[in-house]
Amino acid sequence: TGFRFSLGGAQKKLGVTPDIACFGKAIANGYPLSVIAGKKEYMEQFEDVFFSFTYGGELPSIAASLKTIEVIEREGVINDILVKGERFIQGFNSAAHSLEVDYMRAFGDGSWPKYEIDERFGFTTNEILTLFQQELVRRGMLTRTTPFICYTHSHSDIENLIHACKESMAIVDKALTEKNLHNYIDGEVIQTIIR
């Protein structure tokens, strides 16, 4: 749940107090660590059972997590990501609007922006997404429909992503207008693997 939305995770942002919450990935900035946190009545159950875990007692990860949390607080990391994400959403939608591409839109919270593509002219979302992704890669951008923006991305990186999206949208729109999408695609069409 956390640190994309707030230091206390999504539950803090949404005003929910969960019985149990899990933190992983970002908590130690790449070091192997995950955390289970929860209400005292549930966490006390660990006193009565034997439990073990792969990285139990691995102190460098614990030190990394403490430093990570310190940096997130001190440098305003969460707000920085939020601002960059909001800029991506605004820029993506502005690009789509300027090209009259009404079948692509960005949405969501700035801390976790997403974009979606509607079916058009008998082509599926995955077919259109394939060409869009291909053109983004040609412009040095590798992302799926959720461009996970992080603290190390600069404002220039976000502008470059928006520019690449706009150029890719123009190519997709040309292919769709010509009803010739598959002639623009170099590889296989993206397949949905998780349903």
Task: Identify the role of each PLM range.
Residues T1-R195:
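Conserved N-terminal phosphate-binding loop of PLP-dependent enzymes in the Aspartate aminotransferase
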